[in-house]
Amino acid sequence: MSGVSEPLSRVKVGTLRRPEGPPEPMVVVPVDVEKEDVRILKVCFYSNSFNPGKNFKLVKCTVQTEIQEIITSILLSGRIGPNIQLAECYGLRLKHMKSDEIHWLHPQMTVGEVQDKYECLHVEAEWRYDLQIRYLPEDFMESLKEDRTTLLYFYQQLRNDYMQRYASKVSEGMALQLGCLELRRFFKDMPHNALDKKSNFELLEKEVGLDLFFPKQMQENLKPKQFRKMIQQTFQQYASLREEECVMKFFNTLAGFANIDQETYRCELIQGWNITVDLVIGPKGIRQLTSQDTKPTCLAEFKQIKSIRCLPLEETQAVLQLGIEGAPQSLSIKTSSLAEAENMADLIDGYCRLQGEHKGSLIMHAKKDGEKRNSLPQIPTLNLEARRSHLSESCSIESDIYAEIPDETLRRPGGPQYGVAREEVVLNRILGEGFFGEVYEGVYTNHKGEKINVAVKTCKKDCTQDNKEKFMSEAVIMKNLDHPHIVKLIGIIEEEPTWIIMELYPYGELGHYLERNKNSLKVPTLVLYTLQICKAMAYLESINCVHRDIAVRNILVASPECVKLGDFGLSRYIEDEDYYKASVTRLPIKWMSPESINFRRFTTASDVWMFAVCMWEILSFGKQPFFWLENKDVIGVLEKGDRLPKPELCPPVLYTLMTRCWDYDPSDRPRFTELVCSLSDIYQMEKDIAIEQERNARYRPPKILEPTTFQEPPPKPSRPKYRPPPQTNLLAPKLQFQVPEGLCASSPTLTSPMEYPSPVNSLHTPPLHRHNVFKRHSMREEDFIRPSSREEAQQLWEAEKIKMKQVLERQQKQMVEDSQWLRREERCLDPMVYMNDKSPLTPEKEAGYTEFTGPPQKPPRLGAQSIQPTANLDRTDDLVYHNVMTLVEAVLELKNKLGQLPPEDYVVVVKNVGLNLRKLIGSVDDLLPSLPASSRTEIEGTQKLLNKDLAELINKMKLAQQNAVTSLSEDCKRQMLTASHTLAVDAKNLLDAVDQAKVVANLAHPPAE
């Protein structure tokens, strides 16, 4: 049908929230209507869901139901959004999918008339009903700001029309702007620099698809790298825009290319002779356009129109006659078809209702008896609230008028029946209030007569139909779950008011339980809770279900040793798909993974992230994650690599496991099956540690109780004598007992040969007095031997003071020797010392201890590298030596500045090291041709080793930056220093290799005297 302007539409973009008002209205179907007169219309509309089952609504009606009733019922249902003020802007379009034939349905037409007039022309399944915005206010930009739902709906409609009709025709610059505006609006929580990350952009490309935002032709014409850079740069320009600002910017940009507020029809004006014109109909009235270069000429304003009539002509043509106030004759417009004339008539009539004083229809129809009527009955003038009230009063609660196509992915066959009679449940006190309604404590009497304490979730009476479906979706999912650590569903009452009945757990939410009992809960118990929730999540993983809301507030405590996961209101089955795309805006941002915040993408991997946050909550005794941040700031922190800090009582191995779960790349996170094994090991380890600590607490070391006869402190008992084991060790006969070094230093009596009689002469040892040694009979306090008198206690006290003085003197000596050893080790770690020192190091003698030879040389620590002195050669014009020294200075600068620099400046000092290394390797490459071939292999190998050292230093730097705010920060800095030291040592080894090769080639000279 030529000349018919197809309205704008789009299916998959938008952000529409459901209202929280009165219940959804219903189109009343009289009880006495025969079955053949009942119809079910599938009306498509625009929504934010990628699930096709969410983009339409089935409306049950009769052949006598008017189109206006269907439109109003959908608007009041809340399916497209809340608080619609401009209801008169909406219309219903009937479109034939195979031929693009279009019919705009007048509000006063009945369903029966539509079927008799239009649907009979083609197969019924080939027709589609679309809810569209067709009539716009005069200043629609400002008017739509007052009605956010209509604004977003019109935007979605326009976006769809742009992608279908204009995207391939606009310039690349405009296509880039419009695509990035939609990116900013659609991913409104994404930070401005999110697309700079390669992983984020790949996720957008593969999982979401650039086809939603940019025309395919543009993607094919540009190189991928160039296209990506253009998107990143353009996106930065719109990063600060809010959703409404993106929409308005889109309108203004596209308006420069196409008319977004009017429809154009190619037709003929009949004025004695026929003039072919483009008739432009929009908020400004009816205008004609004779050529593209001229301005439109106004033919009539909508306030001037008094009547509209369509008359068929021969050869499928038709005439549209408009009666205009003050004009001697009507304005006659000749169209190519009757359908086109009727579509124009509906458009003009709609604008007359919107802008004119007369709210009824101006279209005149011929009756069967030949009589004319001036107009059809007026459309009811009730506003939305009054009509909502009127419809609610006229509808029966039990009537089954609206029915969504059931989501079969949420309804699984088999399993027990959960229907419960309301009289079997008695409600008691209110436990709390949820999003949908109150939660009650109650008692359920089952078929055996047993009384069971239950929790009853209720749904508010004024909840919309869509929210009721969401409320019931939790029960639908819980029907299929059976796990010892998942809340058990008892039953469902689907009749109004809807109830969901579940097990009652007296200890309540885990978050409150942790806060109340934080002084008594031990670490093994906390780890046990995490293990149990992990097992529940592994079960959900096995049935392809994502939870999306794992937090302590959604975990219930069944007993002090058992917790259960609940609240499946956000859960979804993902079936064979890899992920679930969220369409709601009420999401727990501080618990979510980066891909969930940026792209609303939920997978098992995002559940792993949330589970790790939940573990952090448990080990923090219920603290909220990122409680020091606002929701909008969380993604920026995560993008920088920052993570939650280690809780005080969290075992380091468990925190390491958490950080693995917080990997930015979802594919690098562990699965729940792996986490169950790891947590089981950690739990067993913590249990063993707790048992050992308890055993140590029971067996305390011996102590002397204070005598009651005096108030002075009692003397400390001397340490029990150690008797070595007999030499009949069956496992290792030659193995001797060795006292640990740390114990020797603090307890010299244990290693004194005078006080360790051998098994041979121990029988001839003279008996010891009571005040010299206390023999310990048991570890109980009441068995300790008390001194018999104050004098004996005083002697013990003096003897202990003498021994303590000897211990302190011996420890001071050892401290001096240890400090000397530490200084030598520090000199070993400083490459500058060995490169400039031409004599081997010797232990220094400390004044006052000349006779003391010191302890034997301690073995080198693991990882310490042996550094030899640099050759004593003439270094004049020696670029290799000069560059090595410069590199070492850069390493020392890194060592000295690392503690004071912020993490973002680490790259400056590391870059300085890298530049100096490049100069060093360049100078060696210049010298290499003059060196013997036999030496080149070693030199080239050392060069490769230096490159690896630099790569390791860079990796350690990145690790230190990522963990700057965590408890691992200092450890990461130490690793960074170790990597830099290794690089400096290998640089010195390269210098030695070059010096040796120069000696072989007779290129080296001794230093000038």
UniProtKB/Swiss-Prot annotation:
It comes from Mus musculus. GO terms for biological process: adaptive immune response; bone resorption; cell surface receptor signaling pathway; cellular defense response; cellular response to fluid shear stress; cellular response to retinoic acid; chemokine-mediated signaling pathway; cortical cytoskeleton organization. Pfam families: FERM_C_FAK1, FERM_M, FERM_N_2, Focal_AT, PK_Tyr_Ser-Thr. The modification Phosphothreonine is found at residues 765, 842. The active site is at 549 (proton acceptor). Disruption phenotype: Mice are born at the expected Mendelian rate, appear normal and are fertile. Mice display increased bone formation and high bone mass, due to defects in osteoclastic bone resorption. Osteoclasts display defects in actin cytoskeleton reorganization, plus altered Rho activity, microtubule stabilization and podosome organization. Mice also display increased differentiation and activity of osteoprogenitor cells. This is Protein-tyrosine kinase 2-beta. Non-receptor protein-tyrosine kinase that regulates reorganization of the actin cytoskeleton, cell polarization, cell migration, adhesion, spreading and bone remodeling. Plays a role in the regulation of the humoral immune response, and is required for normal levels of marginal B-cells in the spleen and normal migration of splenic B-cells. Required for normal macrophage polarization and migration towards sites of inflammation. Regulates cytoskeleton rearrangement and cell spreading in T-cells, and contributes to the regulation of T-cell responses. The lineage of its organism: Eukaryota, Metazoa, Chordata, Craniata, Vertebrata. Residues 425-683 form the Protein kinase domain.
